[in-house]
Curated annotation (Swiss-Prot):
Name of the encoding gene: rsmG
Record-linked InterPro entries: rRNA_ssu_MeTfrase_G, SAM-dependent_MTases_sf
This protein's UniProt keywords: Cytoplasm, Methyltransferase, rRNA processing, S-adenosyl-L-methionine, Transferase
GO (cellular component) term, any one: cytosol
Pfam family, one: GidB
One example GO MF annotation: rRNA (guanine-N7-)-methyltransferase activity
Protein residues bound to S-adenosyl-L-methionine: 72, 77, 123-124, 138
Summary of the function given for this chain in its UniProt record: Specifically methylates the N7 position of guanine in position 518 of 16S rRNA.
Name of the protein this chain belongs to: Ribosomal RNA small subunit methyltransferase G
Top EC category: transferase
Keyword rRNA processing appears in the UniProt entry: yes
NCBIfam families: rsmG_gidB
Subcellular location: Cytoplasm
E.C. numbers: 2.1.1.-
Length: 209
């Protein structure tokens, strides 16, 4: 059912530009199939744009041209959304669950996304052609638990761009041991979307070297 889906916010045009029609198609697909396929819960439909699509898209300016890995891509949040917003960046979506991989492949084909590869694997088991320039993740684990999964995927000098909640700084403070072990430098919380989104997005950005 899509009758309870949130109307498209005005900020969508600002964040997606001429890629907005592709974002609309993906959002419509997620609204019509996401609950049935176990990708999103029914309570997410009234906030699908603001809480999920735009919440992911606001991160796009932090990405650099290169190869970005998205760990635990699930429904495609943020990986597919970022791939729509940033066609100049190559993405590797890492997802272990077969039904989600099927969904991701379907969306990549339908949306015509030429900048996306999908790897069916747990992050710690992923076999990649080369180290990544950046790694994203959303709603996966606490920062200290994410570091062993994400930091080893990066090249020297690569960057973590991890979407987090209001406790982002506390997560950094609680990860001192892992930060040292995985040679993480300059971990900081960046707040995105003020004055643009109804709810801001918080990102932990850090360099691994």
């Amino acid at each position: 059912m899509t009758d309870s889906v949130e109307l498209e916010p005005a900020a969508a045009a600002q964040l997606f530009g001429d890629r907005l029609p592709i974002a609309r198609t993906f959002t419509a697909n997620l609204a019509s199939q996401g609950e049935e396929r176990g990708l999103i819960g029914p309570l997410e439909l009234p906030r699908l744009w603001s809480r999920h699509i735009l919440n992911s898209a606001i991160v796009a300016p932090l990405l650099r041209p290169g190869v970005v890995g998205d760990v635990g891509s699930g429904a495609g949040l943020p990986g597919l959304v970022l791939a729509i917003a940033r066609p100049d960046v190559s993405f590797v979506l890492i997802e272990p669950m077969d039904r989600r991989v099927i969904w991701l492949n379907e969306q990549v084909a339908e949306l015509g996304l030429l900048n996306v590869d999908i790897v069916r694997a747990r992050a710690e088991d992923a076999k990649l052609a080369k180290p990544l320039d950046q790694v994203t993740a959303r709603a996966v684990s606490a920062f200290r638990k994410l570091l062993p999964l994400t930091a080893p995927l990066l090249r020297d000098g690569g960057e973590l761009v991890l979407m987090k909640g209001a406790a982002a700084q506390a997560e950094i403070d609680g990860a001192a041991k892992e930060i040292s072990k995985f040679k993480v430098r300059g971990a900081e919380v960046i707040v995105l979307g003020e004055g643009v989104l109804d709810e801001v997005t918080r990102v932990i950005r850090a360099t691994v070297r």
